[in-house]
């Protein structure tokens, strides 16, 4: 009994731990930007670290189950590398640099709704307006998009949750982003969420033909390293930007590479297999709350009223989508039970035909069932 309960708790603890991990990434990355870290270089180093860390595990544990590489699989891997390590990460970093850590983490709660819209476009999701849960998915998506629009168009007065001490974390360029930069950052975050959602959809297809999760993560990060290195050589002209040392930039690269591009990818794929994508996304608002507190405490960020109102709408919309989606998904065990119950009248009730069952064995006039 205790073992069964522990198995149910493990996915919950894993996803909650990831929310703390993501919140830490928001803060550490923002600190590195304030100290002059270039986001193209950071994305490159991040995926170098992730590749180096994950490759040994892929080689050790998936040597016998790793599928053969084909051209079709390679093109999918290349597309995954473009969508997440290159486009999503750099758009996200641009958004983070031009807004704030708490704002960015709040906006990413729109991810499930964007994924739902893309799933409708690609016919991976259906809507039946006669069903309450289908209507809830549509209404939740509209509410989430509305919350995102509020955060974009209405900034409102600043609200200081925690009075932060002025320590070394606040060094560097700590000025509040201007309105123009805020809009640019918001557009970048929207692009980041869209490419991230597309990444999840393509990843679900890829896992069906390439089910070795560790190897998949390693290959995606490896391709992401190459793509980001090429982009960095084009976009970054200052050689000193590549210098690394014992500073916040190195910490951001190592932390985000290990926790958010390596471990997180793997844990999410495992939890999605066990409990489904709805369960995985339902904990994302926790990251927003943790980041808002840490951002106020560590970075002296002020949360604006528009961000709070928009975040409330996003969370309400998110849970409406999550609830509706959960009604679409049937637990595999439940499916087996339903299937078995449907088979009982046909397969388990033995027909009597002159004292013989369907197979021809004598029944002695007795009807049996299993």
Swiss-Prot record:
The keyword Protease does not apply. Belongs to the drug/metabolite transporter (DMT) superfamily. Plant drug/metabolite exporter (P-DME) (TC 2.A.7.4) family. Residues 23-143, 195-322 form the EamA domain. The keyword Nucleus does not apply. One of its GO terms (biological process) is intracellular amino acid homeostasis. It is a multi-pass membrane protein. Keywords: Membrane, Repeat, Transmembrane, Transmembrane helix. The chain crosses the membrane at residues 11-31, 41-61, 67-87, 102-122, 142-162, 182-202, 216-236, 252-272, 278-298, 303-323. It is found in: Membrane. It holds the Pfam family EamA. Its main location: membrane. It comes from the Eukaryota. One of its GO terms (cellular component) is plasma membrane. InterPro entries: EamA_dom, WAT1-related. This is WAT1-related protein At1g44800. GO terms for molecular function: amino acid transmembrane transporter activity; L-amino acid efflux transmembrane transporter activity.
């Amino acid at each position: 009994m205790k073992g069964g309960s522990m198995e149910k708790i493990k996915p919950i603890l894993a996803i909650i731990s990831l929310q703390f991990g993501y919140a830490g990434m928001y803060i550490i990355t923002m600190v590195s930007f304030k100290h002059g870290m270039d986001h193209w270089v950071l994305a490159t180093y991040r995926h170098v670290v992730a590749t180096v860390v994950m490759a040994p595990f892929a080689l050790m544990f998936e040597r016998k189950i790793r599928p053969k590489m084909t051209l079709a699989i390679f093109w999918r891997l290349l597309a995954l590398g473009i969508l997440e390590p290159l486009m999503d990460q750099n758009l996200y970093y641009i958004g983070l640099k031009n807004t704030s850590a708490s704002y960015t983490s709040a906006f990413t709660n729109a991810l499930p709704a964007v994924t739902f819209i893309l799933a409708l476009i690609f016919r991976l999701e259906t809507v039946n307006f006669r069903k309450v849960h289908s209507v809830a998915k549509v209404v939740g998506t509209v509410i989430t998009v509305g919350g995102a629009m509020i955060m974009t168009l209405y900034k409102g007065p600043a609200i200081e949750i925690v009075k932060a001490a002025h320590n070394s974390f606040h060094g560097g360029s700590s000025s509040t982003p201007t309105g123009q930069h805020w809009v640019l950052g918001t557009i970048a975050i929207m692009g980041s969420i869209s490419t991230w959602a597309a990444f999840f959809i393509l990843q679900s297809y890829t896992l069906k033909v390439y089910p070795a999760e560790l190897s998949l993560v390693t290959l995606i990060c490896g391709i992401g390293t190459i793509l980001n290195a090429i982009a960095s050589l084009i976009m970054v002209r200052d050689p000193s930007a590549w210098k690394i040392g014992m500073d916040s930039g190195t910490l951001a690269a190592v932390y985000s590479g290990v926790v958010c591009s390596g471990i997180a990818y793997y844990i999410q794929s495992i939890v999605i297999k066990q409990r489904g994508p709805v369960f995985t996304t339902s904990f994302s608002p926790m990251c927003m709350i943790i980041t808002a507190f840490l951002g106020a405490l560590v970075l002296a960020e002020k949360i604006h009223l528009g961000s709070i109102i928009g975040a409330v709408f996003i969370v309400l919309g998110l849970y409406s989508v999550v609830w509706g989606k959960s009604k679409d998904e049937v637990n595999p065990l439940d499916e087996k039970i339903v299937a078995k119950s449907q088979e009982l009248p046909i397969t388990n009730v033995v027909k009597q035909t002159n004292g013989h069952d369907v197979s021809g064995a004598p029944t002695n006039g007795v009807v049996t069932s299993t």
